[in-house]
């Protein structure tokens, strides 16, 4: 859910985006360009000029003076992106919306662009040098943003004009941009509030994003909490002696997370990328009480040294090989020996016990109470995440719902930390955490003392959250403009059976939901349809 105030929403409609310049054509830049093309925008994608012609180009009598050579980097990057799987573009014909160029010859073309987004190497000096050139070419009033994930946004505009600073902020897309909905908006102290409001609205309405307003803190919101959780899990796995197969079984759909779970997700993201973010956090957040968690475990360091980075190197925590008869087989890494072994079936009593339970909200409390190794793992994993998230307020966000929104949209979780805590029971979980040596933020106890026993509630069909300064439940901004079926279902269900639910949306409108597997139509669904028509 994106949270917008009506007044802000209306003001932001004054500006229109028709053409975008994407500066940097790497993995993120090329895919961001594709997503802009997906929504019908004209895009110019640029990158640096190669130092010299390569052997293939020389064989064709091409030199560094030829456009084919000068635009080789950007053209190769775009071609690679368009061939990648999953595809970053809706239809191949949409790629015609993207033209290419280079910083040396074509930077003046940004004068016709409505939005300029920088997506180059994570080096502050190089970014500032590019922005100096951009300022000379851009039209005053043009929006300018950075997709950085690790450099403070406020440092990038040193030496830039007032107009540049006023129209500059961070716009952090998550990879792959077409598929992951999170877009973090990070204004600086100089950013015009209307620019911030515009991006919050534009990302939601035109780019299909979950826009989350962030403070300019290390790694912003989603990566700060999400990467911490992954790093904490790495250490828990080492401590408990769990296998790659076991962890991915425990941390996938069964707890409301993607099928890629933990280690497969790391392979997709790239272990080098994850290590880069973790090392960056360790240095950029020296006062973080959990900074030691960002220290890379030995088995991860050795994998990086070996070049086992995941999908990009064809092996990471998993490796695909040709088995007997030429059939492909997926091997998983033994974290102790660092040798690849056939995948093993995973069985835990706690998982067997919860197999019949389809409802995630009922399943999670059962999992965390497990008496076996799986239950112990869940307690360690969830308690560390809840502890860390609670202590990041107000550092990374003043409002707890922003942390949940960012983590869910950025990592594909069905429940963020605070929604998870509500499901587990706030007071009971808090007491258990303290008994096991965890130190959740003091404001959680104060919340319970104030009479609020949950982080979220509902009021007249709209979702509220616990506001720490006022010690009260407050309407989530924009919640009154959104129909939340989870809330409406609680009080406005007028009929249901095993396959359908009928709820009253007001204004003479009924909503009919299907609950059957794959939405198959059987007797229960037909009965629901007939009841709704009656």
Regions found by a protein language model. Give the residues of each.
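N-terminal glycine-rich phosphate-binding loop for ADP-containing cofactors
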Residues: 3-4, 10-534
């Amino acid at each position: 859910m994106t949270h917008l105030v009506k007044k802000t929403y209306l003001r932001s409609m004054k500006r229109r985006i028709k053409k975008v310049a994407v500066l940097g054509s790497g993995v993120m830049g090329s895919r961001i360009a594709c997503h802009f093309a997906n929504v019908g925008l004209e895009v110019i994608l640029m990158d640096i000029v190669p130092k010299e012609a390569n052997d293939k180009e020389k064989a064709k009598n091409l030199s560094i003076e030829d456009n084919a050579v000068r635009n080789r980097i950007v053209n190769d990057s775009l071609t690679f992106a368009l061939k990648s799987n999953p595809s970053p573009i809706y239809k191949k014909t949409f790629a015609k919306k993207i033209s290419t160029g280079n910083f040396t010859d074509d930077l003046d073309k940004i004068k016709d662009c409505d939005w300029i987004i920088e997506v180059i190497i994570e080096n502050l000096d190089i970014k500032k040098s590019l922005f100096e050139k951009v300022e000379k070419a851009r039209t005053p009033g043009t929006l300018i943003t950075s997709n950085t994930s690790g450099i403070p946004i406020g440092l990038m505009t040193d030496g830039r004009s007032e107009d540049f600073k006023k129209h500059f902020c961070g716009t952090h897309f998550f990879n792959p941009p077409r598929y992951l909905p999170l877009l973090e908006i990070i204004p600086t102290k100089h950013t015009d509030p209307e620019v911030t409001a515009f991006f919050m609205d534009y990302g939601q309405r035109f780019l299909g994003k979950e826009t989350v307003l962030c403070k300019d803190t290390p790694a912003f919101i989603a990566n700060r909490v999400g990467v911490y959780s992954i790093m904490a899990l790495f250490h828990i796995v080492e401590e408990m002696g769990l296998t790659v197969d076991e962890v991915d079984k425990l941390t996938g759909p069964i707890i409301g997370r993607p099928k890629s779970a933990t280690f497969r997700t790391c392979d997709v993201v790239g272990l080098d990328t994850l290590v880069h973010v973790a090392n960056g956090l360790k240095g950029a957040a020296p006062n973080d009480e959990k900074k030691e968690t960002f220290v890379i475990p030995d088995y991860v360091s050795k994998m990086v040294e070996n070049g086992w980075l995941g999908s990009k190197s064809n092996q990471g925590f998993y490796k695909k090989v040709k088995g007997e008869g030429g059939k492909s087989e997926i091997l998983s890494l033994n974290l102790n020996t660092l040798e690849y072994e056939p995948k093993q079936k995973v069985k835990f009593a706690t998982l067997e016990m919860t197999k019949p339970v389809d409802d995630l909200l009922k399943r999670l409390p059962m999992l965390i109470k497990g008496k076996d190794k799986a239950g112990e793992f869940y307690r360690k994993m969830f308690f560390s995440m809840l502890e860390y998230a609670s202590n990041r307020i107000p550092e990374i966000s003043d409002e707890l719902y922003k942390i949940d929104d960012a983590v869910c949209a950025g990592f594909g979780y069905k429940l963020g930390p605070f929604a998870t805590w509500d499901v587990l029971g706030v007071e009971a979980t808090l007491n258990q955490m303290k008994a096991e040596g965890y130190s959740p933020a003091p404001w959680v106890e104060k919340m319970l003392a104030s009479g609020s026993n949950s982080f979220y509630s509902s009021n007249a069909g709209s979702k509220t959250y616990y506001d720490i300064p006022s010690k009260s439940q407050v309407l989530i901004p924009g919640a009154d403009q959104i129909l939340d079926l989870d809330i409406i279902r609680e009080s406005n269900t007028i009929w249901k059976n095993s396959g359908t639910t009928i709820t009253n949306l007001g204004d003479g409108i009924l909503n009919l939901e299907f609950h059957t597997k794959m939405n198959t139509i059987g007797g229960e669904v037909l009965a629901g349809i007939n009841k709704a028509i009656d």
